[in-house]
């Protein structure tokens, strides 16, 4: 197809965005311009509270992997992202299980990279002078 191949592997880029409210599994070509498949945890489960769960992320990743194989992608580089910025830099609960599901589905894993946006110096974080009081 139109993807560069490396040692007879056809690569795509799996961008996993794992927040504490949802998990996105989005596969593009190497340039990032062409979307091949994008599935979220919320598309796979009915209850709102389960959108970010590892189970929903696993189902989303399996769907994406099936679509990739259909198109002819055999390997993916993974870019894992948390919310970042002034919010949490820790990936949500679905990140790890989405990555594992992609690996177990038969897709080869190239490079794994954390692309969470980290501010060099940012605007003030929400919560006020005395912070969030529980």
Swiss-Prot record:
One of its GO terms (cellular component) is ribosome. Keywords: Ribonucleoprotein, Ribosomal protein. Residues 125-134 have a biased composition (Basic residues). The keyword Endoplasmic reticulum does not apply. The keyword Ribosomal protein applies. One of its GO terms (biological process) is translation. GO terms for molecular function: structural constituent of ribosome. Residues 114-134 are annotated as: Disordered. It comes from the Eukaryota. Belongs to the universal ribosomal protein uS11 family. This is Small ribosomal subunit protein uS11. It comes from Candida albicans (Yeast).
């Amino acid at each position: 197809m139109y993807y560069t191949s490396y040692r007879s592997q056809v690569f795509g880029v799996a961008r996993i965005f794992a927040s504490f409210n949802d998990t996105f599994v989005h596969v593009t070509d190497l340039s990032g311009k062409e979307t091949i498949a994008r599935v979220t945890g919320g598309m796979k489960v009915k209850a709102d509270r389960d959108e970010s769960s590892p189970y929903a992320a696993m189902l989303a990743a399996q769907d994406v992997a099936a679509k990739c194989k259909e198109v002819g992608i055999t390997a993916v580089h993974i870019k894992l992202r948390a919310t970042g910025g002034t919010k949490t830099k820790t990936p949500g609960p679905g990140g790890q299980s989405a990555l594992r599901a992609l690996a177990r589905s038969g897709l080869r894993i190239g490079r794994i990279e954390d692309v969470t946006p980290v501010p060099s110096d940012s605007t003030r974080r929400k919560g006020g002078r005395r912070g969030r009081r529980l």
